[in-house]
Amino acid sequence: NWRKILGQIASVGAGLLGSLLAGYE
């Protein structure tokens, strides 16, 4: 199911982006 895969990629990407933003603060 490609939608499930895209959802997982999106959640991982959001987590990485959040950790990067948290690191800048």
Swiss-Prot record:
The keyword Secreted applies. One of its GO terms (biological process) is killing of cells of another organism. One of its GO terms (cellular component) is extracellular region. Expressed by the skin glands. Keywords: Antibiotic, Antimicrobial, Cytolysis, Hemolysis, Secreted, Toxin. It is found in: Secreted. GO terms for molecular function: toxin activity. Belongs to the grammistin family. Group 3 subfamily. Thanks to its abundant amphiphilic alpha-helices, it may integrate into membrane phospholipids, leading to lysis of the membrane. Has hemolytic activity. Has antibacterial activity with a broad spectrum against various species of bacteria including both Gram-positive and Gram-negative groups. Also has ichthyotoxic activity. Exists as aggregates of 3-4 molecules. This is Grammistin Pp 3.
